[in-house]
């Protein structure tokens, strides 16, 4: 192969030499040489008997056709060429576009808006922005960027660049890269970015209301707290982002990234990762990576990288490795994945509930705590995230990771998950209940109730209520994000990662590896990861993990194993009843 390439290159250069030497000659007409310069050439006598005196290719074509004009005609052609050349010269370099070092550039089919530096677009530093049906508006702690219908917008701590319909935009606190078919938007540093196909930010089909500060926000057509059937409302202590029906919105205490149509977004006290239907996402303590349906969006506290169509992206607190479609990393076909630090990892086909050190997260197919079929309400002590029907939402006291429909987290095909630190792990096919160091979490297929240390989350088919450590629903001590039916929302204390339909992303607190097509991602450091077929919520600073396709249990601090999901569920019924009773009051 190398020999073939070498011969091909040699022949190519020989051809160029012959062509340049014998095929063309420079324009030798002194009257035109100053206008055309060296970039205009004329054929040699081989094709032009007159050997070119101020003639252009168009003129030579006429000669090839047998036209032989007299000297007078040739002179008139030369004079015409002079006039044309002057016009051409006058038109050169007409348009130039520049932007400032700290400025934003946006483009896109039907409009894009982005900002950079420390500026806000379509909203204010600490202000809220809402928009209309198919509009996009977002804001961030200090910077906000919204974009249009199928466009993408991003901003960055220092610089921002957005692009159009099928373009990708990324930014990062320091560096950011994103891509994707129907692109995603990312931001980094202390900026917020939202996007979506028909996205909505801080708005909904029938509109929503958001506020900031330490206030509460409710909305929704039939919805519950922080969102409505097809609407979304969110607010945050400093940042707020909500989006509409099929949109994506994200914000973060410091960094937030959301992606597109059926993508998923997550948040975390410090790091959060959620993914979508068949996607995998993992996050890392300091870094963040997300991707979209077939697109990718990412941002990072420091650096961010996202990738495209069915690509994989990974990052890590220090190191991260993720792989692709049917690959596995940090786990094997029948292998298991553990979590790092003091965190636990759970998974399960339809299971899912975990909470974090001080935060609570629950979810369910048609439920509502931190997510629901069409409703969403979630909160967190510092960050809040809710999502819609097929979406995934997660938050965590410090770190949280959830994933989507058929995904697995930190575990393998037939494997189970263990817990760490001081946490217990229980699982079950259709019911999971786990709690963390000091938190309790319960969930079920169609009903979920979980609470955190100082948090409480309850849900119902069409109603939800969640609050945070000191916050009310749909808002967070610092940040709040809600989204709509098929939307994704994420925020993160410092870093956020979301990804899309069939994508994979992984990270690690120190080192993280995620894999495969229907595999899931694990996290490390002090992060938690949970997954489940159609709903997943997990967290864990010192958190609990539940897993198992058909139930698996891992040992807690005392090495106790829980294998029977039914018995475990029975043990939690009384707690669930008490929590529901308290919420009803």
From Swiss-Prot:
Compositional bias segments (type: Low complexity): 576-585
| Signal found in the keyword field | yes
Which cellular components does GO assign to this protein?
A: symbiont-containing vacuole
* Region forming the signal peptide: 1-23
Top-rank taxon of the source lineage equals Eukaryota
Q: Where is this region: Disordered?
A: 51-585
Chain intervals for the UniProt region annotation (56 X 8 AA tandem repeats of E-D-[EK]-V-S-N-G-[RG]): 102-549
Q: Where is the composition biased (Basic and acidic residues)?
A: 96-113, 194-209, 218-233, 274-297, 322-337, 362-393, 402-417, 442-465, 530-553, 560-569
Question: In which compartments does the protein localize?
Answer: Parasitophorous vacuole
The record's annotation in Pfam families points to: S-antigen
* InterPro entries assigned to the protein according to its UniProt record, in alphabetical order: HPI-Adhesin/Ser-rich, S-antigen
Keyword tRNA-binding (UniProt):
no
Q: Where is the composition biased (Acidic residues)?
A: 59-85, 117-129, 469-481
Keyword line: Malaria, Repeat, Signal
sequence repeat residue numbers = 102-109, 110-117, 118-125, 126-133, 134-141, 142-149, 150-157, 158-165, 166-173, 174-181, 182-189, 190-197, 198-205, 206-213, 214-221, 222-229, 230-237, 238-245, 246-253, 254-261, 262-269, 270-277, 278-285, 286-293, 294-301, 302-309, 310-317, 318-325, 326-333, 334-341, 342-349, 350-357, 358-365, 366-373, 374-381, 382-389, 390-397, 398-405, 406-413, 414-421, 422-429, 430-437, 438-445, 446-453, 454-461, 462-469, 470-477, 478-485, 486-493, 494-501, 502-509, 510-517, 518-525, 526-533, 534-541, 542-549
Q: What does this protein do?
A: S antigens are soluble heat-stable proteins present in the sera of some infected individuals.
User: What's the name of the protein?
Assistant: S-antigen protein
Please name the source species. Plasmodium falciparum (isolate 3D7)
